[in-house]
Amino acid sequence: MPLILGVDPGSRKMGYGIINATGSRLGYVASGVVRIPQPLLVADCLAERLKVIFDSLSEIIEQYQPQEFAIENVFMAKSAGSALKLGQARGAAIVAAVNKDLPVSEYEARKVKQAVVGTGAADKLQVQHMVCTLLKLSKAPAEDAADALAVAICHANSQQNLIRMAGARRYRRGRTV
């Protein structure tokens, strides 16, 4: 499987993580956090924040040339306004991916945690720890970057399961079904 760009969306900061998934092997490529400049946060200039997200992800896609894009779905917000801003930030990220002809996959936070930690109720530290373990990292990435790497790992595992299921044969009472 090719390079996968995972994204943990946010309207103030957004984590990204890139992994190489070959068969069942996962390899770390890069990760980081796109931070919105303080003046844009103070001015509460959402349109400019969305531009920063779009431009930053476009540059990351251009630099690393991933073949697949996975992003976490919005699962909760402090208020309706926060949910709308987060949804718009996700939209900017998705448009950056689609603009570069990347297929987009979306995953619920619980599914990401389940895929990486083994339980959908995992906390951030458990996710960070398992990301380090699965990718053989000596140092834990920032929380948002670890979450983005977890999204990429979830996508890689989901794709591997689909490949396995497509090639699998079921046996019942000694005969192929």
Swiss-Prot record:
Catalytic machinery residues: D8, E72, D144
Cofactor binding note of this UniProt entry: Binds 2 Mg(2+) ion per subunit.
EC id: 3.1.21.10
Residue numbers binding Mg(2+) 1: D8, D144
InterPro entries linked: RNaseH-like_sf, RNaseH_sf, X-over_junc_endoDNase_Mg_BS, X-over_junc_endoDNase_RuvC
Coiled coil: none
Compartmental location: Cytoplasm
One GO CC term on file: cytoplasm
PROSITE patterns: RUVC
Gene Ontology molecular function, alphabetical: crossover junction DNA endonuclease activity; DNA binding; magnesium ion binding
GO BP term, example: DNA recombination
Binding residues for Mg(2+) 2: E72
Catalytic activity, as annotated: Endonucleolytic cleavage at a junction such as a reciprocal single-stranded crossover between two homologous DNA duplexes (Holliday junction)
Cofactor(s) recorded in Swiss-Prot or TrEMBL: Mg(2+)
Pfam families membership: RuvC (PF02075)
Keywords, sorted A to Z: Cytoplasm, DNA damage, DNA recombination, DNA repair, DNA-binding, Endonuclease, Hydrolase, Magnesium, Metal-binding, Nuclease
Enzyme's top EC category: hydrolase
Complexes and interactors: Homodimer which binds Holliday junction (HJ) DNA. The HJ becomes 2-fold symmetrical on binding to RuvC with unstacked arms; it has a different conformation from HJ DNA in complex with RuvA. In the full resolvosome a probable DNA-RuvA(4)-RuvB(12)-RuvC(2) complex forms which resolves the HJ.
Family of the protein in this entry: Belongs to the RuvC family.
Protein's job: The RuvA-RuvB-RuvC complex processes Holliday junction (HJ) DNA during genetic recombination and DNA repair. Endonuclease that resolves HJ intermediates. Cleaves cruciform DNA by making single-stranded nicks across the HJ at symmetrical positions within the homologous arms, yielding a 5'-phosphate and a 3'-hydroxyl group; requires a central core of homology in the junction. The consensus cleavage sequence is 5'-(A/T)TT(C/G)-3'. Cleavage occurs on the 3'-side of the TT dinucleotide at the point of strand exchange.
Protein's recorded name: Crossover junction endodeoxyribonuclease RuvC
Naturally occurring in which organism (per UniProt): Teredinibacter turnerae (strain ATCC 39867 / T7901)
